[in-house]
A protein has these predicted regions:
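Hydrophobic, proline/glycine-rich low-complexity stretches
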Residues: 1-59
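Interaction-surface and assembly-scaffold signal
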Residues: 1-2, 103-176
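Intrinsically disordered, low-complexity segments enriched in polar/charged residues with Gly/Pro
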Residues: 8-10, 62-63, 146-148, 162
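Weak global preference for isoleucine
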Residues: 11-12, 30, 38, 43, ...
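Phenylalanine-focused residue identity feature
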Residues: 15-17, 22, 55-57, 68, ...
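Short beta-strand element of the conserved SAM-dependent methyltransferase core
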Residues: 20-23, 75, 143-144
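Aromatic- and glycine-enriched beta-alpha-beta binding-site module
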Residues: 57-139
Length: 176
């Protein structure tokens, strides 16, 4: 059964930096990672998308929380159109953050699975680069080598995040 997180009392996440990348992966490798109730969005037959996204949330960007960084690993999936048409829908299989309170909130409210608290999230705005690490060292370094970086601030976007918890599939409406 699919549980829906209520859309009343929506929380709007306000970020000031984001970077995302997509990797093409054979659907046969993706399917075992997904609950049977959802399916990956294929860009061509047999090819799905793995997504890595990093955010910087300034102090107050999510309620009373301090400035923190977030790192998400997800698979792009078919959306639930009965809830609206999102920019995209994702099945989140790992969430990392530099703020434990954010991880706790995300697990409780959105049912998102957390990796663990990250030791650091370094944002280099001048070079459009990020680096994240945990107690074992660096886990991700990413930079945008493009010269035309779009304006993502000041535009509210709707996303759907699917998560599996205790055998139940949850859908969270996210507004960024």
């Amino acid at each position: 059964m699919t549980e829906h997180v209520a859309v009343d009392n929506l929380i709007i996440w306000e970020f000031d930096f984001a970077m995302t990348t997509f990797y093409e992966v054979d659907t046969d490798l993706i399917n075992p990672l997904l609950p049977k109730q959802i399916s990956p969005m294929e860009i061509v037959p047999g090819v799905s998308l793995l997504n890595i996204t990093a955010f910087n949330f300034p102090e107050g960007g999510l309620g009373h929380l301090p400035n923190f960084q977030e790192l998400i690993a997800s698979i792009v999936v078919t959306p639930d159109l009965s809830r609206g048409v999102p920019k995209f829908a994702m099945f989140v299989f790992s969430l990392g953050s530099t703020c434990q309170e954010h991880l706790d909130h995300s697990a409780d409210y959105y049912k998102l699975p957390s990796y663990k608290k990250l030791e650091y999230g370094k944002i280099n705005r001048a070079d459009n680069a990020i680096e994240f690490g945990d107690t074992d060292g660096s886990i991700l370094t990413m930079n945008n080598c493009g010269t035309n970086i779009g304006d993502f601030l000041g535009h509210e976007r709707y996303f759907q995040a699917f998560a599996l918890q205790d055998g139940n599939l949850f859908i969270a409406d996210l507004y960024l």
